[in-house]
Amino acid sequence: MGYKISIDAMGGDNGLNTTIPAALEAVKKDSNLQIVLVGDHHKVKRALDRYSKVKKIKLPVLQRIAIHHASETVGMDESPSIAVRKKKDSSMRVAINLVKDGTVDACVSAGNTGALMATSKFVLKTVNGVDRPAIVYALPAFNRDTKQLSKTYMLDLGANVVCSSEQLFQFAIMGSILAASSKGLAEPRVSLLNIGEEEMKGLDNIKNASKLLQGCDFINYQGYIEGKHIFDDTTDVIVCDGFVGNVSLKTMEGSLRLIESLIKKSITETSLLMKIPVIMSLPLFKKMKKGMNLDSFNGASLLGLTGIVVKSHGSASANAFETAIYEAVKEIKHNIPKTIQESLEKVL
């Protein structure tokens, strides 16, 4: 079965220098994939010609890539309201419009998160039973028993700063459906992020959401999870409001940079004798870094919409953006919006 994805070719910090090579690699590796590059036709065509020559892409592959002109671009610091009201011919808006009219099956963008969420909600609307869409991201998790690296889905990561207990309940259902489809699990484990594991701890909306989840047979609810256990692979879905989720995600990113800086500092400031064991450990560090390659975790889904929209990190590399494309493919295959709709109808 073939599938088609629109790409906001102009979006993100690096624009065409990221989206074009990623699109070429994706269609080269997946013969069922077609891509529509949305953006300034002249600029997109020029970049496509250049990168296709560099990568030696053959004609049959190039024939599965089309260009759809859009005269405007949404800036990374642009107001979401301006993007929705005034940038009606932006590469982001047009790419999402193609999802709405059925021309493509999904959209991928590395553009402004707020603008992408606002535009997606305005154009596609939410499925019945969902008040507001949520941003979900797959985090790396390490199972101490099997010694295997896995994924834990976390939502919301910034779309909704304040959430009611009902909205957290909806997020749990959507996250469970995504985890079941992506990880092949019959009953994904779902947990609420809280300041402690005891039932009396936390804000009222979290405690009330916990009661709703306890009474839902559809959800394999595990109770509360603390921040220190996010990476322990003790759950498959972590639910929180967008404020807590966004702060948590950015703290994780900062922690990784700190660890990398400390390793570099220890190498440069130690004596020659002390550098020997550090140098001998470099292959181990490289292996560890490869296992924790964040490129393989890129691609945040905007869950709860009637169509599929995947958000790539704004500063993503071509490899990372390619991963976001594959995330969209996965959601197309499992028809995530329809599955969410059907599941909500059963429990609400």
Swiss-Prot record:
Subcellular location: Cytoplasm
SUPFAM superfamilies according to UniProt: Isocitrate/Isopropylmalate dehydrogenase-like
GO molecular function, one term: phosphate:acyl-[acyl carrier protein] acyltransferase activity
Main location: cytoplasm
Domain of life: Bacteria
Pfam families: FA_synthesis (PF02504)
Residue runs in coiled coils: none
Signal sequence residues: none
Xref: InterPro entries: FA_synthesis, Phospholipid_synth_PlsX-like
Transmembrane domains' residue ranges: none
Cellular component GO terms, alphabetical: cytoplasm
Pathway: Lipid metabolism; phospholipid metabolism
Protein role: Catalyzes the reversible formation of acyl-phosphate (acyl-PO(4)) from acyl-[acyl-carrier-protein] (acyl-ACP). This enzyme utilizes acyl-ACP as fatty acyl donor, but not acyl-CoA.
Membership in a protein family: Belongs to the PlsX family.
NCBIfam families: plsX (TIGR00182)
Name the record gives this protein: Phosphate acyltransferase
Originating organism: Francisella philomiragia subsp. philomiragia (strain ATCC 25017 / CCUG 19701 / FSC 153 / O#319-036)
